[in-house]
From Swiss-Prot:
GO MF assignments: chitin binding; endochitinase activity
Predominant location: secreted
Stretch forming the signal peptide: 1-17
SMART domains linked to this entry: Glyco_18
Annotated Gene3D superfamilies: 3.10.50.10, Glycosidases
EC category name: hydrolase
Coiled-coil regions listed: 395-447
EC number(s) stated in the UniProt entry for this protein: 3.2.1.14
Positions annotated as active site in the UniProt record: 141
Name the record gives this protein: Putative chitinase 2
Length: 466
């Protein structure tokens, strides 16, 4: 089942030759979750995403530099996340600056003068290269809000223009590529019209990441239960489909547009427990106290017997447990959102955030949400092939190094070492041959599955019930 394409005049249905970007947020606090749900960089499958966004760095009080990570664990995190490229050399590493609670004072100070912008731009390029990042994400929440003066709307464009120019003219170091510049934006009209010069910014960045979530929450007034990330809706423009159209009409080219997909739910406490239909009055946040409930927690609630309900008009699920109402996404709904990207040849998706998926597989298979996104983008064979190419390359590098060592041992007439290295080479070649056989079988199985078609789960099927 495919969504109605909203860009019919521009595009044909289906873009099978296109590769879609998968930007995946990984936040530093993922390390501090309890052991059952914490996600360390070493446990990330580096082929799930095309870009990793590490959040969030903070601009210091001077507006000229980023603050140093405040403890050893965070300092070491840069190195650990970048090491994923040893397994997948094509994985791009993006550093995100800002976020909800780390934006306002630093950004306003940064753009307060032309001199600050020029200094910061030169400094950040050196910083990104030193820490082996491939790009920068600007997540200012938001110009002209929370004490930011109205002039910051224009000055943010000045910052973006300067960064884009310096990124473009940078003399690229050996084995490096040009730095990527992305902008993460709130798509809602209440922010969009006041905070952003959309054309001015979008024309200079490589990608525009739209946060297609948190459309509703405990901050609403009047407070009523509503899903925070509906795909469609007939009675409100606050839905992914309509907001994407709005931003395209505002001047964002579709090949730059990245749609955000949440891996968390938003909860409410119902005013009256037996009045739980969408739009019912609420008195505050639910058990998450406004922080959001990760999928790796929600899946246990559903597996425990709480009935999953579905909003067909909005194409998203919700649950009611006592007086708590939770709107969230499941594998079906994120697959439909990814299909919207595929069907309209948008640039890709932004996952917020990777550590909120069921990455340990405690409710079933590992990475259920991320795999649903990959299938929705018709990128599963790309995912499989990337893993296989990397494994083959790794073995060939090991064999090459072993052969170099073997030549050295022979030159030194170290017969014991020669015999040992010859055996190692035979073992590696045998392992490679076995791995190639396994990979061929895995690819065959994957292709057979795709030939049968990967359809959306039935609406009545409860997620994580298998």
């Amino acid at each position: 089942m495919y969504l109605t394409i909203w860009l019919v005049p521009l595009l044909a249905v289906g873009t099978w030759g296109q590769k879609f970007n998968r930007f995946c947020h990984y936040n530093s606090w993922a390390l501090s979750r309890n052991p059952q749900h914490g996600l360390v960089p070493e446990d990330i499958d580096p082929f799930l995403c095309t870009h990793m966004i590490l959040g969030f760095a903070e601009i210091d009080e001077s507006g000229l530099r980023l603050k140093d990570p405040n403890h050893y664990q965070q300092q070491y995190l840069y190195q650990r996340i970048v090491r994923l490229r040893r397994i997948n050399p094509r994985l791009n590493m993006i550093l995100s600056v800002g976020g909800w609670d780390k934006s306002q004072e630093g950004y306003s100070k940064l753009v307060s003068s032309r001199e600050n912008i020029i200094f910061f731009t030169k400094w950040i390029i050196t910083y990104l290269r030193r820490h082996d990042f491939d790009g920068l994400d600007l997540d200012w929440e938001y110009p002209t809000f929370k004490g930011s003066p109205m002039v910051d709307k224009k000055k943010f464009v000045d910052l973006v223009e300067n960064l884009a120019y310096e990124f473009d003219i940078e003399e690229i170091p050996d084995i490096k590529w040009k730095l990527t510049l992305t902008w993460t934006a709130d798509p809602l009209e209440s922010v969009r019209t006041s905070a952003y010069d959309i054309k001015g910014i979008a024309s200079k960045v490589h990608y525009v990441n739209l946060k297609m979530y948190d459309f509703h929450g405990h901050w609403d007034d009047p407070l009523r239960v509503n899903h925070h990330s509906p795909l469609t809706s007939s009675n409100s423009p606050r839905n992914v489909n309509e907001l994407a159209k709005t931003w395209v009409k505002a001047g964002v080219r579709i090949e730059k547009l990245i749609l955000g997909i949440p891996f968390f739910g938003r909860s409410f406490t119902l005013k009256t427990a037996n009045m739980s239909a969408p739009g019912s009055p609420a008195v505050g946040p639910g058990s998450d106290f406004g922080d959001g409930i990760p999928i790796h927690n929600l899946c246990h609630i559903i597996r425990g017997g709480t009935k999953e309900l579905y909003l067909p008009e909005k194409k998203v699920p919700y649950i009611v447990s006592g007086s708590e109402w939770i709107g969230y996404d499941n594998p079906r709904s994120v697959m439909e959102k990814a299909q919207l990207v595929f069907n309209n040849a948008l640039a890709g998706v932004m996952i917020y955030s990777l550590d909120m998926d069921d990455h340990h597989g405690t409710c079933g298979k590992k990475w259920p949400m991320m795999m649903a996104v990959i299938h929705g983008l018709n990128a599963y064979m790309e995912y499989i092939d990337s893993k296989h190419k990397s494994l083959e390359l790794t073995y060939n590098k090991k064999i090459l190094r072993a052969r170099v060592s073997l030549r050295n041992y022979r030159r030194r007439n170290q017969q014991g070492k020669v015999a040992e290295m010859e055996q190692r080479i035979r073992n590696l070649e045998q392992e490679l041959q076995q791995s190639m056989g396994n990979m061929a079988y895995e690819r065959q199985q994957a292709q057979a599955m795709l030939n049968r078609g990967v359809s959306l789960p039935p609406i009545e099927q409860q997620s994580w019930s298998w």
